[in-house]
């Protein structure tokens, strides 16, 4: 039974179901989450199943080990229109 469970978990990891990613999670308008203090980002990243901090030089939340379904910011798909 343990071998079967191990096989299922290994298979799921290989097909990417249990994989995680890192990046700047975006808001509904496509912009990064603005921050100055770490505790704000820690709460956001925990919501997405990971951990994170405020990347001070960019004033944006960076998250590690968040779920793959979480939309993250990228330069190629940037839809944020800063006001």
From Swiss-Prot:
Where is this gene product found?
A: Secreted
> Keyword Iron, does the record have it?
no
Which keywords does UniProt give here? Disulfide bond, Ion channel impairing toxin, Neurotoxin, Secreted, Signal, Toxin, Voltage-gated sodium channel impairing toxin
PROSITE patterns the record matches = LCN_CSAB
A GO MF term = toxin activity
Disulphide bridges, residue numbers: 31-80, 35-54, 41-61, 45-63
Q: In which tissues is it expressed?
A: Expressed by the venom gland.
Propeptide residues according to the Swiss-Prot or TrEMBL record: 83
Q: Which residue ranges does the record assign to the LCN-type CS-alpha/beta domain?
A: 21-81
Please provide one cellular component term from the Gene Ontology annotations of this protein: extracellular region
From which residue to which does the signal peptide run?
A: 1-19
What exactly does this protein do? Sodium channel inhibitor. Possesses potent toxicity in mice but induces only paralysis in cotton bollworm.
Q: Which family does it belong to?
A: Belongs to the long (4 C-C) scorpion toxin superfamily. Sodium channel inhibitor family. Beta subfamily.
**UniProt note: domains:** Has the structural arrangement of an alpha-helix connected to antiparallel beta-sheets by disulfide bonds (CS-alpha/beta).
Query: What name appears for this protein in its UniProt entry?
Result: BmKBT-like peptide
Q: Which organism is it from?
A: Olivierus martensii (Manchurian scorpion)
- Give the classification, highest ranks: Eukaryota, Metazoa, Ecdysozoa, Arthropoda, Chelicerata
